[in-house]
Regions:
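Positively charged
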Residues: 1-136
């Protein structure tokens, strides 16, 4: 189901809680909401649709990948950039890593480990920041 985007900075600034198998529908809602906003958005965290759970979705080109309880396990090659966010106005400076490795659970609750680089790594880092209440 397509959800409304949360723009409440106080809400977004609060950390999320671990996701469980009971939260699968939230992942589906993220898929629907990202699809509805695809012209202006490439990733989303569950708190952006009003749910404080550790769930994100990242556009990886031709597919959108939902990650439950994602954790960055390695990172390298730091750089500075500017980013925008559906929940905020304008763009802001931030620091990211060119390459990351992330562990997460998929829809089947199978643990995955994936190496990401460039734009996809940047999107993933932005969304994982949302989970800890960090806003660009």
């Amino acid at each position: 189901m397509v959800k409304q985007i949360v723009r409440d900075i106080f809400f977004l600034g609060q950390p999320s809680k671990p996701a469980t198998k009971a939260d699968i529908q939230i992942g589906k809602d993220l898929q629907d909401t990202l699809q509805a906003n695809r012209e202006r958005c490439v990733g989303m965290a569950a708190n952006m649709i009003g749910v404080k759970k550790n769930i994100i979705i990242v556009n990886m080109g031709f597919i959108n990948v939902v990650m439950f309880n994602p954790v960055i396990v390695s990172k390298r090659d730091m750089y500075e950039t500017e980013e925008g966010c559906l929940s905020l106005d304008g763009v802001r400076k931030t620091t990211r890593y060119q390459e990351i490795e992330v562990e997460y659970y998929d829809f089947n609750w199978k643990k995955q480990r994936q190496k990401l680089s460039g734009w996809t790594a940047q999107i993933c880092q932005h969304e994982i920041d949302h989970l800890s209440g960090k806003i660009i």
